[in-house]
Amino acid sequence: MISDIPKVGQKLSDILSEKFTYEDLRARDKISKEKRSLRNLIKEMEDEVLASAGVDSFEEIFKLIFTKLYDELICANDKTAYLKFRNSGDTDFELKEKIQGLFDDAKKKWEGVFSDESKILLSPSHLAVCVSTLQDIKLFNNNLDVVDDAFEYLMSKAQKGEKGQYFTPRYVIDMCVKMMNPTVNDKIIDTACGSSGFTVHSIFKVWKEIRLSKGLEPGEDFTASERTADERDFVRDNVFAIDFDEKTVRVARTLNLIAGDGQTNVLHLNTLDYSRWNEVTKQEDWNDTYNEGFKKLKKLQPKGSSDFSKFHFDLVMANPPFAGDIKEQTILSHYELAKNDKGKWQKKVGRDILFIERNLNFLKPGGRMAVVLPQGRFNNSSDKYIRDFIAERCRILAVVGLHGNVFKPHTGTKTSVLFVQKWDDKLCPQKEDYPIFFATMQKPSKDNSGEKIYVKDGNGEILLDHHNHFIVEHDLYNHDGMTQDGIAEAFVEFAKKEGLSFFQ
């Protein structure tokens, strides 16, 4: 058509460029339409492009996901806007310029994840292939699974599983959230946050309650739409997360910034080595990024305490690293569990053991905790002193045994989730004899190679929920009324019968 001849100042790409809205992306989304996973698309990108690109795969893919999330956010909130994260008609050099500009805008929107000077390092031709691969994937979805799956893959490659640090599957997190029942008044922290799943899913649960209390539609969870003031305030004032790994913290901050509409208290600190926090937090670079959140965390110390040894949280949920021992005496000297059952200091102590004590010290009286631990801590006769330590300080609410495939392919270590509530005269009066809820996960949720097993319909087709997401086959809870009640529902019934304070 004559009208399509470029005007003065227009490039050919301006004419060829496909006008593509967020609604178009929803309709074309490869994940729901072709049943592709972002993890597998990234693997393909690595094999075809990144292996020969001479760049840090984690950093460059992180930049692209970060940029694409920003592009989706802008277009979801402005129905007339067109997505820019697309390869349609641009030369490779024009595309790189466009994507770099988008990345720069994203950095301004979500500060403290990438430095101001950070650039996309992929060559124009490599970037063009990567953008084409990612452009028809909708990253904003209901439950973070899409993005989280990709980040877990990238992190596991970057870290090679050092320190036994693996992301907790979202279905395990959701079970814990349903059983611990966070509310709008709770102060919540994850002390070994990984990608921050426990806190983000707690946010989703509380947001639903806030919206329902105001007569609003619950809406999507991890969504591009704006939040109410009450929803933002909850994230700003009540939700915290800590991790010692800088890359992990940046991923967690990204997900929290987006889910929390610009609010985040994710901090780069060594949870166990709190005697050095004063030293770490005085560093200028650290301060620029994390000071706002740290000031709020300091206020949650009990009266008269200022050494970061104790805090006043209502709820701690965590999956601490369970590989490797702590040998530094400067750290061990702060922990009672660093002594053996005869009261003598040990030369080395399992990291997860110290996390048990540290997590309990984050809780106020009546506070509750869900923590993933190696199964041996519940059975080994040599670990009896740990079980005694917990029982003296808390009511043991529940122990849920997870299937051995849950953390595959990273590890086949058998794990259980421990749920406790700290003794308190009002919320959890001390008693010697009380029932404990025990359950064991029967459905593996993953096959032996670590691939998720999905629920299928009567024709053998993978079943999609009403958000167009796959449903992992497990027996931890009922998935939006589409699967049977599971362990979480049975615990809620138990908790109400027992009159537990957080279900009254």
Protein language model annotation of sequence segments:
Residues 1-106, 199:
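Charged, often flexible domain-edge or linker segments that flank or initiate folded functional domains
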Residues 5-24, 274, 280-504:
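A conserved structural/catalytic subdomain of Rossmann-like adenosyl-cofactor enzymes
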Residues 32-43, 147-152, 225-227:
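Active-site-adjacent bridging/hinge elements
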Residues 45, 146-171, 177-180:
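Class I SAM-dependent transferase core
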Residues 52-53, 177-178, 227-229, 238, ...:
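Generic recognition of flexible, low-complexity loop/linker segments
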Residues 61-62, 66-157:
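Long recognition/docking surfaces used for binding and targeting
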Residues 140, 162-166, 344-349:
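Short acidic-aromatic active-site loops that bind/stabilize oxyanions
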Residues 165-296, 311, 315, 323, ...:
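Conserved S-adenosyl-L-methionine
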